[in-house]
């Protein structure tokens, strides 16, 4: 009996121990981080692994991935996600570069990529030998929609597919017909059928099939963002017509993935852009196309080749009873009205700014699911000296991002700008295209009259979105002069347009901002990241491993009293457990290839000086002075790609979104948030943003802090869009601080855009009055305009508060005499 009691007691103790261990493991291992389920990440063996389409169907979520230029198939897969978040890799997968999706109601099938999926989840694949190309869109057939659908490829291959037999009939041959392998960084293949390259959208309605592309197949387009590129084209079943020669992406209608319910009369919508602003088209069956312009929050999507966009969309994320359209375009989530027609162009509104690169999205189980393009093994043309010799991850991977239905309203401020005319000749009496005027609390317009005549600019508004225009105001601008035109809250309208009374050479840029209600303090999710003033921290260099290891490598270090010592090599898989490994080869590789580059920026007493890869000079604000020695010693990562084909730049306590050089790079940099964190390194992995520089005891209750099993290494895990919660951008500095300046010579450009409150102080050491001329560039395109002049007396520190409706991208200064000058700005 005694032995029985003893055995029972031991068994109870063992069970309690196991229960405690399981509880501890539950604390350590989290199913999801910031809406990312690490085990749902997908990999391929290609230079990029983006998400082409995300569709709920047959009680599952179906996902396809793509590699960069693979018209004959690839290692990419078709994935089936179950409601309990299990990932099934379908054995029918044949890969490629697909981004098409359509639900064909009559046959009750989902067409996604080269696959047809019935209502029971059975999959059939259409081989690339029958239908070559990078499948970019589907459309309902013009004459037999019950039995046939259209497929379109990125190189203008067009096909009819029998929905029953999947028999394929080629209408126009794909541009990859020669069978040669296309290098990912070469000029896009061209096809004689249509202008432009890099197809994006396909749809049908009003007796027409519509096709878009967003690039140009020239060497020039690989380098520049402001070349002629792209097309919106129409096909009536016999002949092609170019509707507009610009970079277009989405083309759809209120019927979305199903096709329009009333195809003869329902509107067709198209989104695109040029170097000036976002384009929005709407087509009426009788009146044809009407076009409108919207501002850009992010310029990282620009580029004449069209590669930087993935697939911007307009998707219905509502319910069958209550449709709700969400649009993605140039870094903004937009609310898009399902009632948008040529005669009712009201209701489009900005929601919030985002950083993820999104290929497709949908509503599933009362959440939003965004399919992203996160970690490309090859950075393509996105190389710059600020990154040093760093590479992409060893293997491309991306993930789904699950969010609440309200997340599109909760990210970054919707500050944005766009032009209707940009350094161009305009005729007398010419009227601009309508530009969106509603949706922002702070609005202004910059106008530069570089012509020979004094010009009156007439501003008109369409108050109700019904094409009824009324005069808002007239502004006369002298030849060779510029002006900022603020708009009050009482000056209302859906759209605004501009007319000039004389011929001129002009720029007209609308610059809008929403109030930044963030504080300067970080959200609790960042607890445990080391403060910059501390001399002790757990850091490390990060690398997503290749060779199908599907883990994150961390070459850990510890900083004690300012001295950095390497502490070992660790790996983390999809269970988010940091485990020490003995791997000299990988350790050496990370140490060599992912070392933080030396002296890629210059931090002087006035600001951060950047000389970009084209030799252009830019200046950014300073932050906490403790960042300077750490930056100079290459202890803080400055620049890295953590979302495909754009960089995350971190300098002097501010994170910035940095477009690729071919999207104009630093000229279009955008501050995200400011912080006081000693971040050693950062990288993307399985859809997450990973950062090092941890004080573990301060983050012990934070699920975003992951500590190794031996307690000697740690990382922070979240998503890139968590960075909006670090705190609003702040800083101080300027292009001059007790600087010897020459009369009439402009200073370097200094960033002023996207900050909340801005104060300027001007001073000099001369014994006479000095006139300071203040110029701004509202667009980032070198559109320098005089803002104002200030006369500063000897020994005076002149202060100027910028008004709340002031918004521009860059600022610079000139003086009317040689002097030693200071131009100092505080952003708070």
What are the functions of these language-model segments?
Residues 489-506, 804-819:
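Noncatalytic modules at the cell exterior or secretory-pathway interfaces
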Residues 68-72, 117, 156-157, 216-219, ...:
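Short glycine/acidic-enriched loop and turn motifs that connect beta-strands
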């Amino acid at each position: 009996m005694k032995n029985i009691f003893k055995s029972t007691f031991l068994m109870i103790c063992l069970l309690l121990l196991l229960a405690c261990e399981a509880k501890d493991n539950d604390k350590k291992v989290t199913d999801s981080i910031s809406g990312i389920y690490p085990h749902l990440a997908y990999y391929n063996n290609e230079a990029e692994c983006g998400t082409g389409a995300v569709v709920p169907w047959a009680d599952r979520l179906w996902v396809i991935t793509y590699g960069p230029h693979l018209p004959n198939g690839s290692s990419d897969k078709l994935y089936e996600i179950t409601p309990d978040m299990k990932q099934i890799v379908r054995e029918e997968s044949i890969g490629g570069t697909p981004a098409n999706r359509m639900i064909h109601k009559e046959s009750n099938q989902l067409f996604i990529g080269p696959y047809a999926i019935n209502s029971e989840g059975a999959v059939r694949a259409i081989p690339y030998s029958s239908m070559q190309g990078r499948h970019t869109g589907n459309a309902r057939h013009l004459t037999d929609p019950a039995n046939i659908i259209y497929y379109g490829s990125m190189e203008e291959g067009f096909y009819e597919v029998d929905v029953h037999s999947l028999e394929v009939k080629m209408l126009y041959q794909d541009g990859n017909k020669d069978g040669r392998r296309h290098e990912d960084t070469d000029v896009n293949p061209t096809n004689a059928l249509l202008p432009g390259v890099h197809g994006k959208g396909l749809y049908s309605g009003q007796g027409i099939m519509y096709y878009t592309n967003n690039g140009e197949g020239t060497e020039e387009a690989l380098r520049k963002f402001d070349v002629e590129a792209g097309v919106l084209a129409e096909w009536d079943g016999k002949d092609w017509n170019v509707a507009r020669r610009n970079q277009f992406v989405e083309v759809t209608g209120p019927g979305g993935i199903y096709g329009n319910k009333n195809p003869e009369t329902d509107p067709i919508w198209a989104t695109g852009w040029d170097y000036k602003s976002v384009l929005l088209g709407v087509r009426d069956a009788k009146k044809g196309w009407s076009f409108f312009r919207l501002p850009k929050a992010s310029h990282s999507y620009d580029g004449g080749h069209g590669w930087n966009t993935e697939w911007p969309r307009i998707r219905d994320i509502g319910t069958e009873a209550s449709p709700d359209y969400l649009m993605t375009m140039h870094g903004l989530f937009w609310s898009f009205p399902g009632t948008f027609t040529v005669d009712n162009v009201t209701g489009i509104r900005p929601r919030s700014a985002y950083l993820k690169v999104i290929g497709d999205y949908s509503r599933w189980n009362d959440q939003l699911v965004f399919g992203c393009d996160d970690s490309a093994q090859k950075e393509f043309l996105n190389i710059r000296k600020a990154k040093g010799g760093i590479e992409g991850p060893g293997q491309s991977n991306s993930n789904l991002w699950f969010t609440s239905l309200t997340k599109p309203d909760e990210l970054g401020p919707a500050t944005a700008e766009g032009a209707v005319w940009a350094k161009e000749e305009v005729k007398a009496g010419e009227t601009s295209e309508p530009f969106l005027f509603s949706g922002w609390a702070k609005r202004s317009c910059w106008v530069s009259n570089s012509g020979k005549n004094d010009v009156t600019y007439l501003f008109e508004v369409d108050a109700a979105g019904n094409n009824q225009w009324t005069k808002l105001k007239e502004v006369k601008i002298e030849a060779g002069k510029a002006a900022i035109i603020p708009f009050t809250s009482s000056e209302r309208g859906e759209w605004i347009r501009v007319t000039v009374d004389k011929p001129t050479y002009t720029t007209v840029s609308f610059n809008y901002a929403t109030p930044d209600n963030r504080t300067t303090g970080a959200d609790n999710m960042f607890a445990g990241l080391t403060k910059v003033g501390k001399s002790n921290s757990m850091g490390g260099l990060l690398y997503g491993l290749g060779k199908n290891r599907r883990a994150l490598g961390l070459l850990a270090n510890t900083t004690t009293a300012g001295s950095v010592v390497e502490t070992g090599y660790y790996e983390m898989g999809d269970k988010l457990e940091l485990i020490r490994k003995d791997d000299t080869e990988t350790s050496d590789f990370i140490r060599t290839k992912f070392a933080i580059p030396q002296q890629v920026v210059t931090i002087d007493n006035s600001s951060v000086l950047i000389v970009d890869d084209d030799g252009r000079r830019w200046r950014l604000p300073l932050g906490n002075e403790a960042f300077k020695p750490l930056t100079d010693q290459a202890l803080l990562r400055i620049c890295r790609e953590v979302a495909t084909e754009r960089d995350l730049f971190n300098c002097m306590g501010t994170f910035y979104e940095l477009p690729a050089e071919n999207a104009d790079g630093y000229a279009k940099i955008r501050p995200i948030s400011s912080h006081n964190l000693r971040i050693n390194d950062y990288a993307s992995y399985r859809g997450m943003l990973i950062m090092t520089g941890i004080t573990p005891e301060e983050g012990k209750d934070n699920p975003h802090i992951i500590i190794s099993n031996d307690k000697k290494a740690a990382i922070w895990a979240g998503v890139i869009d968590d960075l909006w919660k670090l705190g609003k951008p702040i800083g101080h500095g300027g292009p001059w601080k007790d600087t010897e300046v020459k009369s009439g010579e402009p200073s370097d450009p200094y960033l002023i855009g996207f900050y909340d409150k801005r104060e300027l102080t001007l001073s000099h050491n001369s014994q006479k009055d000095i006139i300071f001329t203040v110029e701004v560039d509202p667009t980032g395109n070198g559109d320098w305009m005089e803002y104002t002049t200030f006369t500063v007396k000897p020994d005076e520190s002149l202060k100027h508060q910028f008004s709340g409706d002031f918004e521009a991208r860059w600022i610079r200064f000139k003086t009317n005499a040689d002097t030693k000058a200071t131009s100092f700005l505080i952003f708070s």
